[in-house]
Amino acid sequence: MIVTEKVKFISNWIKAYTDNMPNKAQSLVIGISGGIDSSVSSTLSAMTGLKTIVLSMPIKQKSFQHDLSMKHQEWLLKKFNNVEAHTINLDELFRAFSHSLSNFDNEHGFANPRARIRMTSLYQVAAA
C-alpha cells in the first residue's frame, strides 16, 4: 500500500469508528505540540471531515516548541474548513500546582503532571 492509500485508509477508519459509536461523536479533540505524532494525528482527524478541535497547551514550553505548534495550527486552519483551533496557556495553572508542592520539588516528578493537566484539559473540551 502506498503512503496516500495508507493515509486515506487510516482517516476512513477513524471516521468509521466514530460513526459506529453508540453515541456518535460530533467532533474529535486533539492536543498539538508541533511534534510529528500530534501533527499526523491531527491531520488524519481533520481529513475525516468531522469537526476537529486542536488545542495547543503550553506549559513551560520553549518558544521554538510552541512556535511549531502554532505553525501546525495555522496550516490546519488553512487546509481544512472543519478545524477549530485554540491555545490554552496552562503555565499559571502549573505554577500554582508546583508551588503548592514546593516541599517536594523534583523536575522529573513534575513531568507527569504536565501531561495529566493537558489530558484533563482535552477531556474538558471533549465533554463540552
At which residue positions do the language-model features occur?
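ATP-dependent adenylation/nucleotidyltransferase module used to activate substrates
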Residues: M1-A128
